[in-house]
Amino acid sequence: MRSRRVDVMDVMNRLILAMDLMNRDDALRVTGEVREYIDTVKIGYPLVLSEGMDIIAEFRKRFGCRIIADFKVADIPETNEKICRATFKAGADAIIVHGFRGADSVRACLNVAEEMGREVFLLTEMSHPGAEMFIQGAADEIARMGVDLGVKNYVGPSTRPERLSRLREIIGQDSFLISPGVGAQGGDPGETLRFADAIIVGRSIYLADNPAAAAAGIIESIKDLLNP
């Protein structure tokens, strides 16, 4: 069983909005302001736990955008299956899954995604400093496990370009790689896109005085890296 690969052409401007505001009205307002620049939104626990799972369907209905549920699923296979099924039923197009729980837990997510026509992103390591303590040491093996399982979509840190480069080396050019940590955490858009297919930006956009201008500025900085 193999997962599908997200096509880079499907991610407008190679830019994904990370929406972690905790208020529905603010989240919808900001997304509406930047919708002309993005067509993919990563929604995480802060917004969903504050406003409920229905917010996923509301985003899809209002903006017609792809939704990646950043739930970093990390449980036993049976529980992972339930989490993924509920998330996809709520309207998410894809879900982010931790790899450190092992092949059986990841496979449970892949099976549900295939059944429901959705996608899985495998997280090999995270972008914050604490990731160096434990998960980074296993990241290469997690990536190799993903390749063995047929995973085609991955998440890697923009804050450590050398690790992003290593991840790309392991998963190959045919896999789709998205990268958080650009902006507030210090990741550089252009450097990140040397290895990743799309960057994920949150606070630098949704906390900006003018979110639309912030998004436009990021796109301007990477215009030479965008598809014609």
UniProtKB/Swiss-Prot annotation:
The gene is pyrF. The active site is at residue 72. SUPFAM superfamilies: Ribulose-phoshate binding barrel (SSF51366). This is Orotidine 5'-phosphate decarboxylase. The keyword Lyase applies. Pathway: Pyrimidine metabolism; UMP biosynthesis via de novo pathway; UMP from orotate: step 2/2. Homodimer. HAMAP family: OMPdecase_type1_A. InterPro entries: Aldolase_TIM, OMPdecase, OMPdecase_arc, OMPdecase_AS, OMPdeCOase_dom, RibuloseP-bd_barrel. Its EC number is 4.1.1.23. GO terms for cellular component: cytosol. Substrate binds at residues 20, 42, 70-79, 127, 180-190, 202-203. Coiled coil: none annotated. It comes from Methanothermobacter thermautotrophicus (strain ATCC 29096 / DSM 1053 / JCM 10044 / NBRC 100330 / Delta H). PANTHER family: OROTIDINE 5'-PHOSPHATE DECARBOXYLASE. It comes from the Archaea. GO terms for biological process: 'de novo' pyrimidine nucleobase biosynthetic process; 'de novo' UMP biosynthetic process. It is an enzyme of class 4 (lyase). It holds the Pfam family OMPdecase.
